[in-house]
Swiss-Prot record:
Active site: S82, D207, H235
Subunit composition and interactions: Monomer.
Gene: bioH
Function description: The physiological role of BioH is to remove the methyl group introduced by BioC when the pimeloyl moiety is complete. It allows to synthesize pimeloyl-ACP via the fatty acid synthetic pathway through the hydrolysis of the ester bonds of pimeloyl-ACP esters.
EC annotation from Swiss-Prot or TrEMBL: 3.1.1.85
Protein name: Pimeloyl-[acyl-carrier protein] methyl ester esterase
């Protein structure tokens, strides 16, 4: 079986698995490792087809979650950013023995806008998918720029995201197209409604990809979960506001100690 790239570090007793988003790799977490490592045993994963886990083609959400869970510690906290939030959520649903708590960051159980549900317009995602075959690198850059739009450190944050992408071989177009298909089709709203493990949802007030209205809608639909909207942050709050973000994670872990 092909192994995913899985980097472990940290001095804490609590396992915390971090899953990156579309087009990126586990290097995106390096800006907060120093803040979290004294408190957790961190597991930084390159999702199938991304970063140093290149030997994979496009996968469905269920298959990706199953593959990631095969190398996972038992009873970890799972933190998933953007598309990684869908993967972490799917693992929590299908393999709860791996999970003691779930944190999603700038993520949505349904990324696509639907009737009475805010999200990315289907034609925008379809456009990105079409553009991948025309101008691969520029399409990825445009998507990264959207993630930092509106923050005080927007340009700096976008450069950091771009440097993370360029650290390693770019994912194949097939893998990126498969990821966009997950964002376009996944809908875990009903499945997560009955989720009973500790669950925190973190949003950026300025996020142009996951509207903050998602937070209030899910507060009503999922009253057993908690949400935080970070002021001044966009789609990557751990990059623009690393100290505040790390405190959120530490507080969540402390409140949900076993």
């Amino acid at each position: 079986m092909k192994q995913l790239y899985w980097y472990t570090c940290g001095e804490g007793d609590c396992d915390l698995v971090l899953l990156h988003g579309w087009g990126l790799n586990s290097g995106v977490w390096h800006c907060i490792i120093d803040r979290l490592a004294p408190h957790f045993r961190l597991h930084l994963v390159d999702l199938p087809g991304y970063g140093r886990s290149q030997d994979y083609g496009a996968m469905s959400l269920a298959d990706m979650a199953e593959r990631v869970a095969q190398q996972a510690p038992k009873q970890a906290l799972w933190l998933g950013w953007s598309m990684g939030g869908l993967v972490a959520s799917q693992i929590a649903l299908s393999q709860p023995e791996c999970v003691r708590g779930l944190i999603t960051v700038s993520s949505s159980p349904c990324f696509t806008a639907r009737d009475e549900w805010p999200g990315i317009k289907p034609e925008v995602l379809a456009g990105f998918q079409h553009q991948l075959s025309d101008d691969f690198h520029r399409t990825v850059e445009r998507f990264l720029a959207l993630q930092t739009l509106g923050t005080e450190s927007s340009r700096q944050d976008a450069r950091l995201l771009k440097s993370v992408v360029l650290q390693h071989q770019m994912p194949d177009v097939e893998v990126l197209t498969g990821g966009l298909a997950i964002l376009r089709t996944a809908d875990l709203r009903t499945a997560l409604a009955g989720f009973t493990l500790p669950f925190m949802r973190v949003y950026g007030h300025l996020d142009s990809l996951v509207p903050r209205k998602v937070a209030s809608l899910l507060d009503s639909a999922w009253p057993q979960t908690q949400s935080v909207v970070m002021q001044g942050a966009a789609h990557a709050p751990f990059i623009s506001h690393p100290n505040d973000f790390a405190k959120l994670i530490l507080n969540f872990a402390e409140e949900n100690k076993k």
